[in-house]
Amino acid sequence: MALADFALVVGIDSYPGLRPLKGAEADARDFYDWVTDPAGGNVDAQNAKRIVTSDFAPLADSADGAKPVRDHIEDFFKMVNKAAARNAQAQQGIAAGRRIYLFFSGHGFSPSLDRSGVLMANATDDMPFNIGAQMWADRLYDGGWFEEVLLFQDACRQHFPSADVTPPFFQSRNPPQDPPRKRFYAFSAKSGLLAVERPLANGHTRGVFTSTLLEGLRLGAVDAPSGDVTTNQLKVYLESNMQKKLTDVELEDADISKVPEVSHADPFVIVAGRPGAPRTNATFPVELRSAAPGKILNNDFEVVAENFTGPPPWTAKLQRGLYQYVLPGGGTTLFKVTGALDASQQPVVTIVSV
């Protein structure tokens, strides 16, 4: 029998002991909708746990009574461990499931380059109660609780050297090497930098990372030939598109992360292609600026556009990927079509100047 997939989705807006957030719960709800959608993550709702601020209404006025706290998140991991025990008893191996999605949106911190924590609702400046999201992902991966581990964290990663991340309570274990395990981690900010939430085109406040992430997962990060949403394409999509949602002021702020931190980006399919899936062969505008028209070659050195007529600039529509613009005299310019979208969700024109 095939192993099940799991998902933990956490979004915390209310921090009585810190600055409140406006978009973390909305981010979590949107991710939960995607991860339980049969056309998205396809995780059975009985294996998906969503924990958000409004679950604990009326909200506490002080940090002492604020929720969710670490116990609420750790209850999910207890369920995971029980699933692994059931599978072992049924002689299905020691894994709890095939894949797990871990999504966290809220305040966060990073005491060092290799550690990252998400603050719980009862956190204060002098009592940073937290969950070690990255450490949990590492423990589930290293111990073979899942074959595939995906971690998405939309939270700041400011350095607090005096604070430490709360480690997992699972004991380390050495799993069999087969089947080979894979993982993919993406953080909204690089270590030491801030993440941003802001009103987007629809007027709703959202994390710019989560908004970009879900665009990619909803077939924006499709591998054109296969129709699959892959980790490779999602990495490119996140690194190319998140900064498009930042304002000019935010782009100039040295404390704000312009691109996400993507690590352990093992190659695998996140969402398998489906016949007729939208945007599988999506094309994006390219503007060519040169003295004379040339031709465009793809990564396999095949001509994909030529015979441009009329005065410059010339235009073309291309799928995501790497290309060469070759001029009649032999000059060559490399360029990439990323599929980036602007704040109104319209494709950004790739300009190629020679």
Regions found by a protein language model. Name each.
Residues 1-20:
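Short glycine-rich His-centered loop
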Residues 7, 95, 222-302:
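Caspase-like cysteine protease fold
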Residues 11, 22, 28, 35, ...:
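Active-site-proximal C-terminal subdomain of hydrolase catalytic domains
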Residues 28, 33-97:
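Functional beta-strand-loop-alpha-helix junction segments that form "active/interaction loops"
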Residues 66-166:
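Caspase-like (clan CD) cysteine peptidase catalytic core
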Residues 260-263, 330-354:
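Structured interaction patches on ligand/partner-binding surfaces of diverse proteins
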Residues 300-312:
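Short, acidic Ser/Thr/Gly-rich low-complexity loop/linker segments typical of extracellular
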Residues 320-331:
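A short, solvent-exposed beta-strand micro-motif common in secreted/extracellular proteins
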